[in-house]
């Protein structure tokens, strides 16, 4: 099969289109014919060596496609089903991908492959942080930093879905997008607005940016009995800090896909390009430069 291979770890110029050996499905796995993959920040971290990786690997952490074979223990999927999954380090930049059944979710008929794959990683992190990490309840006031990113966008929607009053930070295009799509959300420009100007008013703050400055401001803006969650920080000397690690789950992905189908959630896609080494390099450069307006998608077939 064809795949995009990273010949030298840490060198994205060494990405090449290559022929690799076909995959064999094991008992608990599903073999998927790739239709779309998302370009995720974690792929860059794995590729540059900061999160593992190796020479000659295939990058990619999310996939949407068609089931072409199932292992003998698989019960929830059959050949021909449409599927989406987050498979960290799952080598998804390829014509076919192996997905453990526990990570897989069915794509509803009215959801495109691109829309489905756009939410399986960042969307899952955003949703789980609000629902399981911060355990947001109706009537609470929630602040989401980085609201226009894939994590922040779903965090906003999950908080609204829970019945919370929501504020968010963004800049540039993100400000306009959030105000257009979520008029009920108070949107701040993180470059110019002081989120703590009104004191400690938030019951829960989700920091999807991860900088020390943002985290410090978050605590200033959070009530004494409130909670703060960050996608980066793993420990903090403040009783309000929530320790939470998102575990990939097909069940959570199914919730998100069903939400897309019903209109309960939306996805925002920046671009769709054919999967190739050149386009992976292009999208990586765009992510690193900033200013991406939604999820970057690569398609197959």
What residue spans do the PLM features occupy?
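Glycine-rich beta-strand-centered segment in the early N-terminal region that forms part
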Residues: 21-38, 48-91
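C-terminal hydrophobic helical "lid"/dimerization subdomain
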Residues: 254-301
């Amino acid at each position: 099969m064809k795949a995009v291979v990273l010949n030298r770890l840490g060198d994205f110029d060494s990405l090449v289109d290559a022929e690799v050996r076909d995959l064999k499905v094991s008992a608990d796995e599903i073999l998927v014919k790739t239709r779309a993959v998302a370009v995720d920040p974690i792929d860059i971290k794995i590729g540059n060596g900061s999160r593992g990786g190796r020479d000659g690997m295939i990058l990619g952490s999310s996939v949407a496609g068609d089931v072409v074979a199932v292992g003998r223990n698989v019960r929830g999927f059959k050949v021909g089903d449409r599927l989406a999954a987050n498979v960290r380090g799952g080598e998804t930049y390829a014509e076919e991908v192996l997905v453990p059944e526990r990570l897989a979710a069915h794509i509803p008929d009215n959801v495109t492959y691109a829309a489905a794959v756009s939410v399986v990683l960042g969307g899952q992190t955003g949703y789980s942080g609000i629902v399981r990490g911060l355990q947001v309840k109706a009537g609470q006031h929630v602040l989401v930093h980085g609201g226009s990113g894939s994590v922040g966008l779903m965090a906003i929607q999950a908080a609204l879905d829970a019945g919370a009053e929501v504020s968010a930070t963004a800049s540039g295009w993100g400000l306009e997008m959030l105000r257009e799509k979520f008029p009920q959300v108070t949107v701040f420009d993180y470059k110019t607005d002081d989120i703590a100007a009104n004191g400690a008013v938030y019951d829960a703050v989700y920091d999807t940016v991860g900088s020390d400055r943002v985290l410090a401001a978050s605590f200033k803006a959070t009530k004494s009995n409130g909670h703060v969650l960050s996608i980066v920080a793993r420990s903090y000397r403040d009783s309000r800090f929530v320790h939470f690690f998102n575990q990939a789950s097909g069940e959570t992905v199914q919730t998100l896909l069903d939400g897309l189908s019903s209109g309960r959630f939306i996805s925002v896609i920046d671009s769709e390009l054919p999967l190739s080494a050149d386009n992976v390099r292009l999208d990586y450069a765009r992510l690193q430069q900033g200013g991406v307006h939604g999820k970057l998608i690569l398609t197959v077939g």
